[in-house]
Amino acid sequence: MEAQHNETEAAGKPAAKKTTRTRKPRASKQATFIAEAPAMPIAIKEPGQFGRVNILNCQPSVEDDVYAARVEIGEQFTVSAQVFMEGRTKVGATAVLKNPRGRIMARVPMTVENAGLDLYTAKLQAGEHSTLNPWDAEFAEVKKQLGNWRVAIEGWEDTYGAWLHDARIKVDVLSDVENTLTSGSELLTRWASTRDANLNAEQRKTLREAAKSMMDTSLDAKSRLTFADNADIEALHETNPLRDGLTSSGDHVFHVERPKSSFSAWYQFFPRSEGAYLDDNGKKVQGNFHTAVSGLERAKAEGFNIVYLPPIFPIGVTNRKGPDGALNAGPDDPGSPFGIGSELGGHDTVDPLLGTMDDFKAFCQRAHELNLEVALDFALQCSPDHPWVKEHPNWFRTKPDGSIAYAENPPKKYQDIYPIDFDNDLEGIEREVERIMNLWIDAGVTIFRVDNPHTKPVRFWQDVIAAVTKKHPEVLFLAEAFTRPAMVRALSYAGFTQSHCYFPWRNTKPQLEEFLQETNGKGGYYQHNTFWPTTPDILTAYVRDGGVAAHAIRAVLAALGSPSWGIYNGYELIENRQRADAEEQSSNEKFEIKVRDWSAANRIGISKLLTSLNEIRSKHAATTSYHNLTILPSANENIIAFARQTEGRFTKDGRTDTLIVVVNLDPYNEQQSSIHVDAKALGLPTEHPYRVKDQLTGREYDWSWDNFVSLAPWADVAHVFHVETGEQPLD
């Protein structure tokens, strides 16, 4: 029968790529070709029915394709499916990638991952990797590549492969030779004339001449077989196969998001602490948006690309909290920026102590000049002084005595915060939040970090994010939701681009191995975990007690364990004094202004390490994907090792990028271990050693299958090896 489908100009080859600047991608011409295959009345797969080839379990699938899997533009990702036919019939499979306009951008042959399970896989890349920012003029071309891409799996009977398998056996024992060779000659002739194979004139000529030579009875059988069994024909079989019984799955949607949706490096600081100092009387003088430029410059110097600010709105006076959340605030206590709203304004107003809206716009402009995006904390809650309390009393819950209920998480009480009640005027609250977010976007904000979104209805966030991104598709959302996995997953489905996660509490080797695989496995298609060693709300015992070594260990794990990571400023200064009653810093910056001596950072060395880690990330494509991490076996429970690898067809220079990360988890003692590397699985040399170069120290070693490491907290807490394969870069 006739099977119709679209072809690319170069079958099996993805569109051309580059890493930094992005040009308009070239799409192949779309044409309809007729597959001249034997009559197979069920070759086309109808919805709910099996085709001639059976295709099952197409992955990734998020909630049975109710929600789209998500990847960053240019990010390497893997698709898989079970493809099979009856009996011992050989099959082949192809992954077909289509852009939002339906054009086929790549047709990639799939490889057998598990023959017993009929499982085939292929690695794909949607669009071209870019480092452009939303304000760059060229970003318009990036935007054209964003949106819903589609992947279909094509299965087909591998007639040539099956014939060749049997022909080798029969010719070797001289069984039914003439019928076998005649069938092969006819197969090559049909292959040469099949338009589905998309052969050029030279390739068709090769097949026809081979078919003719196979019928030369003056030659012995083995010589005749070689005309169909050689490297040239095998190469055509890989790139331009004869595909009988062609069957296609339905399209599976992948939502392709803009740069930094997956691969990002965050730096958090409080503007009021930047440039703060003690006056002659020992009184703290807070910083503002002018002095906070120093935070931008520090973030840039250390290699971060997103600066994240806590709420910058007016702070309430009623029930204002004192140091470390004390119930009674003194006259000079600045209060928590999360107690939002005063007589000066609410979420749409700049705190006058920080400056004006024009000052904030100038701050954002300076950030953009430094190639830094500005992320703003959006905490949807109010102080008792917020204008909404008077303007929209139905947005809050009242107690039987008529008073408004403040926030509680027993035994904790937050008298300075009123939570929102969404059940009386959901649409009105949505419209107001959309208005406010658009206001800050116009001022220069491109990302919102949402505080405690899990305490609000998921549908609310789904509506708000959809409305905001419809107008501003470049805007990203980070969910600060330390809660149950189902809720975090739901928030991701609702549109949150990234998520805070439980990385700070994953400290042992088993915990980390499980969490790394969870983050970089199927979950990475809908939930982008961002690894933060500490935050203003989190200071674990591991970091508290482990000193400089613990800070270094956690930084390496965060930077290389996830494509997205973040640092809360002060990490460089080992600020690790913990409150007695909470797992967070004492003298917490949420409640007071910090005056810091940044000159100590160079002496401690963490700042230099952060810079090195971000430099490694910027140079190595292997660090950019949530779908390329492999745990490596190590013999010591205090040593963890993993590899990240991106294939050469997805890198700027065409060379496969492989990183091997080895970390000592013990911040007190030297640890030694053997590390096993499955060289074959990673495509590394199997018969001889290969060279690895430590990206932190520059030292080089010869590695192979099993390797010895020794790491000490007073020397190197980690190795970050780049495998020097000797591949030549593309011209």
From Swiss-Prot:
Catalytic activity field: alpha-maltose 1-phosphate + [(1->4)-alpha-D-glucosyl](n) = [(1->4)-alpha-D-glucosyl](n+2) + phosphate
Record's keyword annotation contains Hydrolase: no
InterPro entries: GlgE (IPR026585), GLGE_C (IPR049171), GlgE_dom_N/S (IPR021828), Glyco_hydro_13_cat_dom (IPR006047), Glyco_hydro_b (IPR013780), Glycoside_hydrolase_SF (IPR017853), Ig-like_fold (IPR013783)
GO terms under biological process: alpha-glucan biosynthetic process
Residues carrying the site annotation Transition state stabilizer: 537
Binding-site residues, alpha-maltose 1-phosphate: 321, 381, 416, 452, 590-591
GO molecular function: hexosyltransferase activity; hydrolase activity, hydrolyzing O-glycosyl compounds
Assembly mode: Homodimer.
Name of this chain's protein: Alpha-1,4-glucan:maltose-1-phosphate maltosyltransferase
Organism, scientific name: Bifidobacterium animalis subsp. lactis (strain Bl-04 / DGCC2908 / RB 4825 / SD5219)
